[in-house]
Amino acid sequence: VVVRGEKKEALLKLFAAAFETVRPNLEKVFADKPKIVEGMKSFFQTYGGAPVFIVAYAGKSASGQWDTHSTAAALQNLLLAAYAEGLGGVWTDGILVKEPEINALLGIEEKKLVAVVPLGYPDEVPRVPPRRSGRVQWVGFE
């Protein structure tokens, strides 16, 4: 679902409320980095000023299972394609704690919310951090 305008603004209010739900966990994980928690709060309130949100849902497969893997693969491809076109986006799922409210706002029934991707042209492109050595171990193909 592509969301903009008034519904996007209503979603931002839900996202800000979602932050308060996830904040205790973030404060534990980043106990020594409070600026990260405050940065996340700011992001939840604005979603980077993106003009549109992609709200991704999974339906059920013929077997009755949620198609979350297919939705995840589609979102990853969307993010790669967006980057290739100069757009910025980020996969967010902290807002899943507000799924019932998001579904009600968008009129979605019988689908599972997977993620929300804010999408737009970035103000800047961050530098790619250097890779840490020793994080990948090759076992074969020698």
Could you tell me what each predicted segment is?
Residues 5-7, 59-61, 100, 121-124, ...:
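Short loop segments at secondary-structure junctions
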Residues 112-142:
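C-terminal helix-cap and adjacent tail motif
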Residues 38-42, 102-104, 125:
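Glycine-rich, charged/polar anion/phosphate-binding loops
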Residues 3, 93, 119-120:
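Conserved residues at the C-terminal ends of beta-strands
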Residues 48-52, 87, 110-113:
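Short coil/turn connectors at secondary-structure junctions
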Residues 54, 59-105:
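Small-aliphatic-rich amphipathic alpha-helix that forms the alpha element of a beta-alpha
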Residues 45-48, 105-110, 131-132:
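Solvent-exposed alpha-helices and their adjacent loops that cap or buttress functional pockets
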Residues 1-71:
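Glycine/small-residue-rich phosphate/adenosyl-binding loop
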